[in-house]
Amino acid sequence: MKNCERFANLALAGLTLAPLVVRVNPNLNVILTACITVYVGCFRSVKDTPPTETMSKEHAMRFPLVGSAMLLSLFLLFKFLSKDLVNAVLTAYFFVLGIVALSATLLPAIRRFLPNPWNDNLIVWRFPYFKSLEVEFTKSQVVAGIPGTFFCAWYAWKKHWLANNILGLSFCIQGIEMLSLGSFKTGAILLAGLFFYDIFWVFFTPVMVSVAKSFDAPIKLLFPTGDALRPYSMLGLGDIVIPGIFVALALRFDVSRRRQPQYFTSAFIGYAVGVILTIVVMNWFQAAQPALLYIVPAVIGFLASHCIWNGDIKPLLAFDESKTEEATTDESKTSEEVNKAHDE
């Protein structure tokens, strides 16, 4: 891990814990936390092998519709069912997800302090009555699961803002690390769709704000304000993950060309500008704002402007990680065939 990545991880940990001991300006906290989380997730997304699955254009076009259906369903559940019952079910669901996400987030750091057999040797566990079902894991994954279980139990018991944020940040980092848009065309379709999705549900209906306030699960980050009337500022995880996977794609584009992360820098600066604009407008109007309204144009605008300036629009639009994956697979098959022929 490079020094800047290590510093970013430490900065994110310190910023998350800081409100426990000192009063941190919530606006500054939102901006720094969002930006550092995207930075960490982006560099974790750079792998030696291309992603096994990428989002298609059809999936990107359907995403806002599926998101709208889920949002409206949650709104109706909270409206017609007991809020405590709905949150109890959601807490159980996120308990399992939280253990998996936090364990995966901590695993790279934990592996460095464990012996190699703990990291490499797989343990296969079969379900007692379903022999066909099996789970593979290593001892290091079990060790990483211990703090994951602790924080999930703490959140389920106390619903403390720190436990909420630790789980939320884990979801964000894993989302940016694991999700691949495949191409910038798909990314533009997704961001454009969610741009209008965010505007509609925040400005034209009470649904988004109502669900965010009622949904007692780590789908948003909470930043203590010290104000009894409004104890927390909130930032939805989607406002980090959705632009984050686009910024991560820009970083992997730079890496694929074996160049300095110039387009990543442009997209990342665009994200930071978008978050700052969101905070400024929110404080100016004293009302909830659809963050993607400001983040999406900033990210795409900064990246596109830089590409146009350098004359790199064509290679940017031609970049496709799914094709990279196919090429890598073909190369590995060819290599295997050559080795077999050599052995014969």
Curated annotation (Swiss-Prot):
Q: Which residues lie on this side of the membrane: Cytoplasmic?
A: 33-62, 111-136, 182-188, 252-263, 312-344
- Which residues does the entry place in the Lumenal compartment? 1-11, 84-89, 158-160, 210-230, 285-290
What keywords are annotated for this sequence in UniProt? Endoplasmic reticulum, Hydrolase, Membrane, Protease, Transmembrane, Transmembrane helix
Q: Which GO terms describe its cellular component?
A: endoplasmic reticulum; endoplasmic reticulum membrane
Membrane topology of this protein? Multi-pass membrane protein
What does the entry's free-text domain comment contain?
The first transmembrane domain may act as a type I signal anchor. The PAL motif is required for normal active site conformation.
Q: What is this protein called?
A: Signal peptide peptidase
Gene name, per UniProt, is SPP
